[in-house]
Structure formats: structure tokens, C-alpha cells
Amino acid sequence: QPYKVLEVSNPQLREKLRAVSANQSQVTDASHLFVFCNKTSVTDEEIDQEMRLRASINEGEAEKLVRYGEFLKNSMKKMSALEMYHWTAKQTYLALATAVAACAELKIDCSPMEGFSIEKYNEILNSSAQGLSAATLLAVGYRHTDDQAQHLKKVRKPVENLFEVVS
């Protein structure tokens, strides 16, 4: 889990973030704003900590986890800094998808978002100092009863244009 999720609750910070988010209203209007940040690098110690955590939860798996940890360390040593950045950023989207599914299950509205300045978010949230970089956003809450968009039908590509069977 090479990422961290920041919940931004400070209204002044959210105003600053909105200004560098193409003025998307959800940044300030949603009751909760989550910024999914990827780690810019992963250390051997962090991998060891993760393996210890997994071993403490899944007793009897320690030997397999040591091998898996070594595999991860060796794989990551082969990555350039840019490859590491891209890989960890992709991991945030897996967490984002889980959060969106959880919101749907709980019947809570949410809006996964991009369209913001990563550099400015990192500056405003001081995330770079923690070895993090903003990757994606999730605005969460209940829509306003006057929200005109709630009555619009969702537009999606036809299934036959979206999926292709490869045989």
C-alpha cells in the first residue's frame, strides 16, 4: 500500500485547492474531500514493515512473506524513479475504486476527480515533505436537493464499443 489518503477538512485549504482544481465545486462543496497521495519511493524498511504486518495477521505465512518481500525489494530496485512514481500512483486508483464501491454500497454520493494541479496540491498540502504526491481526489457527501445534474442520465459508451473479446 504505497500511498496515503489525506482528508482535507480545513475550509481555507479547500478554497486554495479549488483554485488549482479547475474551480471544480466539489472540492469545497462536498462534506469530505480525500486526496489520494502516492509515495514517491518505497524503501526496503517499508516493505519489511508491510511483511511483518501481514505475518502478524496471517499466522503461518511468515516464510512465504519473507520471499515475497525479497521479490518486491528486487523488483523495485530495478525501477527508475519515474517507474516507481507511476507504479505507486496507479496503486492509489485501486484504493480509489474501493472507496467509490464502499460509497455506492452505503448509498453515499461521491465524485472521483482529476483535473487539478498536482504540483500546487503538493505545495498547498506540503505532501512532498512526507514523500507523497497527490494522485487523485474523491469528494464525498450527499448531493444538494437543488443539484440539476442529479436528474441527468449517465452517458456511457455502448458495451460493444467498450469491451472486446480477445480469443
Tell what function each PLM region has:
Residues Q1-S167:
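Acidic, surface-exposed loops and disordered segments
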